[in-house]
């Protein structure tokens, strides 16, 4: 129901060009790891729309502060999305690593799609310049979450789906 409501909303509000390829062999009874860039909050709705019914329900790791976003914070909590503290220091990193491992143990129980935004944050021109990223349209990747998911569930994943959200106008899978 949650995804259907989001799909209806994005379908009514968005006249984007969708370039979706390589999804014919996917199925809703498997486990998938999705790697995607991250331009805006709309990316999540886009991913839900293009994968709905093709792969299992999408799960992603959220900053703890997002639990306080009206309505959707409660929805994410009720849907058992993992919330990360993302603090500085060894203790905070260990807590996030433990949260990631615990979430992956739950994900093993029923078909799930784990999404990892490898840039770790939304793309902006200022962040791109500050990082001196060698990529034209991407920030430097952070592979910690991806590596942890692979270490915990690697053999269970049927495929790694590489998604590129482009220009906020066209979406390509």
What do the PLM-derived regions correspond to, one by one?
Residues 9-172:
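Soluble catalytic domains of membrane acyltransferases
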